[in-house]
A protein has these predicted regions:
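Structured alpha/beta reader/binder surfaces that contact nucleic acids or chromatin modification marks
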Residues: 49-138
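Contiguous surface segments at macromolecular interaction interfaces
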Residues: 1-47, 126-184
Length: 184
């Protein structure tokens, strides 16, 4: 079973109801600070999401769709191309870790429970989070999303893949620690 790390942050201006180009219906209004982390929205709605909506729907079918997506994917940097394709192809039941940027070192863990979705009704520019997956988040005894500490999962929070938008976790020390923590 694969394990992934995902950051779900975005700019507050991306959802300003006073600026029609960046407003997304049914999403929260502007947030209290720049670079607000959308983790709370993702937890409440059982999703993970990443940006680059201008690439378009990665599930668009047929030859025309494949060519359009290929052109769009070639327009982004190679590492972003990899993020998007890995996110799209992430198998069901994959384990995902999402950091809480308001409390460094806190993480939420969940299991991918739904296929890739692209939200066509979100503005493409400048909104960043059109690519989404459903997630069943681990819950504590009160039914709230369970908080894990990075240190307990053998994860260092400085540098490396912690700074990336999306990354597969291949280190068996980390994946074993995640499995042990989830059993408790």
């Amino acid at each position: 079973m694969p394990y992934y790390f995902i950051r779900v942050g975005g700019e507050t201006g991306h959802n300003n109801p006073n600026e029609l180009i960046s407003y997304v219906k049914n999403e929260p209004p502007t947030y209290p600070k720049k670079r607000f982390n959308y983790y709370d929205y993702c937890l409440k709605n059982s999703i993970i999401r990443i940006g680059w909506p201008d690439v378009g729907d990665l599930a668009k079918g047929g030859r025309a769709g494949a060519l359009a997506n290929l052109y769009s994917l070639q327009s982004v940097k190679p590492h972003i191309n990899k993020y998007l394709l890995d996110f799209y192809h992430m198998p069901l039941k994959s384990i995902v870790l999402m950091p809480n940027k308001d409390i460094p070192g806190n993480l939420y863990v969940g299991e991918v429970s739904g296929a890739y979705e692209y939200y066509h009704d979100v503005p493409r520019d400048p909104y960043e989070c059109a690519h989404r997956r459903k997630v069943a988040w681990d819950k504590d005894s009160h039914g709230n999303p369970k908080v894990y500490r990075a240190a307990d999962l053998n994860i260092g929070i400085l540098g490396g893949w912690w700074l990336r938008a999306f990354h597969e976790i291949a280190d068996s020390k980390i994946t074993d620690a995640i499995d042990k923590a989830r059993e408790k």
